[in-house]
């Protein structure tokens, strides 16, 4: 029977294994060779403020050493092939593939530092992002991710798992930009006075009372037969006292988010630009959906901090290019 004592009678040294950690002092991922009995220390700053990445596949060797050719998968237009799996698209996606499969659902941090104690009910950023993005998509929001790239550097490689990069400061940046660009954060601008004045007043009919339009969607009170209501171009009707105060703050229909013209020229230009064609004047055919861009640095960081893709254009190892992937 084998034992943990060698022929000289001393205890056998525990084998060292390569494990991946996120260093909060250096703000980057590092690979450390440690034994099960040793405390990990960052090889760059020699500090112990680390969190271990849990291996989602124990049978697969993960090597995230940036000096190794096996550390990252080759860059092969990942955003056009992988990001639609996050948000959904007209193209069919493999069953079960979603946000979590791309950003790494099992790559949850496992605290190994004595300076940090995990909590069982800790905030799960990956679940939060998935739910948030799905909510935005359900309202018809279009996303465009703009990636700062170093095309002249042949060493550019995509991480095997985006969660390896977006955990830590990269994840905070992603959440911050999503929150700042959330179309529901500030809402749409007020409708123009001319558009409000042009809304017709119609009489409530018995047929209307028998339909789904038998109540005001703002106050939820049922309409009375023969009463006057305001009608939006999308045909939804509301009490005048309910609709007009809303349109003085937002140009969108409270039910379907159809948008009336505004007096904000910047907003109108953005709406017409995202449409690409059409009059953009609030017709049903020209109805706009929210659209915003998220700018992220190239998700690759060398341990010496170079090649991060976060510098200014024309500096460092080559010119930065901005490339966008529109997720319709």
From Swiss-Prot:
The keyword Acetylation applies. It is an enzyme of class 2 (transferase). Its EC number is 2.3.2.27. Residues 264-328 are annotated as: Disordered. Residues 306-319 have a biased composition (Gly residues). Pathway: Protein modification; protein ubiquitination. Signal peptide: none annotated. GO terms for biological process: protein ubiquitination. The modification N-acetylserine is found at residue 2. Keywords: Acetylation, Metal-binding, Transferase, Ubl conjugation, Ubl conjugation pathway, Zinc, Zinc-finger. It comes from the Eukaryota. A zinc finger (RING-type) spans 216-257. It catalyses: S-ubiquitinyl-[E2 ubiquitin-conjugating enzyme]-L-cysteine + [acceptor protein]-L-lysine = [E2 ubiquitin-conjugating enzyme]-L-cysteine + N(6)-ubiquitinyl-[acceptor protein]-L-lysine. InterPro entries: RNF126-like_zinc-ribbon (IPR039525), Znf_RING (IPR001841), Znf_RING/FYVE/PHD (IPR013083). Expressed in leaves, roots, trichomes, stipules, and also in anthers and stigma of flowers. One of its GO terms (molecular function) is ubiquitin protein ligase activity. The keyword Zinc applies. Auto-ubiquitinated as part of the enzymatic reaction. E3 ubiquitin-protein ligase which accepts ubiquitin from an E2 ubiquitin-conjugating enzyme in the form of a thioester and then directly transfers the ubiquitin to targeted substrates. Promotes polyubiquitination of target proteins. This is E3 ubiquitin-protein ligase RING1-like. It comes from Arabidopsis thaliana (Mouse-ear cress).
């Amino acid at each position: 029977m084998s034992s943990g004592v060698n022929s000289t009678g001393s205890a056998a040294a525990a084998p060292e294994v390569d494990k991946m950690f996120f260093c909060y002092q250096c703000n980057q991922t590092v690979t450390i060779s440690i034994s099960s009995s040793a405390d990990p220390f960052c090889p760059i700053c020699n500090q112990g403020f680390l969190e271990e990445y849990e291996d989602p596949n124990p049978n697969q060797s993960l090597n995230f050493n940036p000096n190794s050719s096996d550390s990252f998968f080759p860059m092969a237009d990942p955003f056009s092939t992988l990001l639609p799996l996050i948000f959904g698209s007209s193209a069919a996606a493999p069953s079960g593939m979603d946000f979590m499969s791309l950003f790494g659902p099992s790559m949850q941090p496992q605290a190994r530092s004595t300076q940090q104690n995990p909590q069982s009910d800790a905030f799960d950023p990956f679940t939060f992002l998935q739910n948030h993005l799905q909510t935005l998509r359900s309202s018809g929001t279009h996303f465009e991710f703009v990636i700062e790239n170093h095309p002249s550097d042949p060493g550019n490689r995509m991480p095997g798992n985006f969660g390896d990069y977006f955990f830590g400061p990269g994840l905070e940046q992603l959440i911050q930009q999503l929150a700042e660009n959330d179309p529901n954060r500030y809402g749409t601008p007020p409708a123009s006075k001319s558009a409000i004045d042009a809304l017709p007043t119609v009489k409530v009919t018995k047929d209307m009372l028998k339909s789904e339009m038998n109540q005001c969607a703002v106050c939820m009170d049922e309409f009375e037969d023969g009463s006057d209501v305001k009608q939006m171009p999308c045909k939804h009707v509301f009490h005048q006292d309910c609709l007009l105060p809303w349109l003085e703050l937002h140009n969108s229909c409270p039910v379907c988010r159809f948008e009336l013209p505004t007096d904000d020229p910047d907003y109108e230009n953005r709406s017409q630009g995202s449409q690409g064609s059409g009059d953009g004047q609030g017709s049903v055919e020209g109805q706009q959906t929210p659209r915003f861009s998220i700018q992220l640095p190239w998700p690759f960081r060398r341990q010496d901090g170079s090649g991060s893709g976060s510098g200014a254009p024309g500096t460092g190892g080559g010119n930065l290019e901005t490339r966008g992937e529109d997720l319709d």
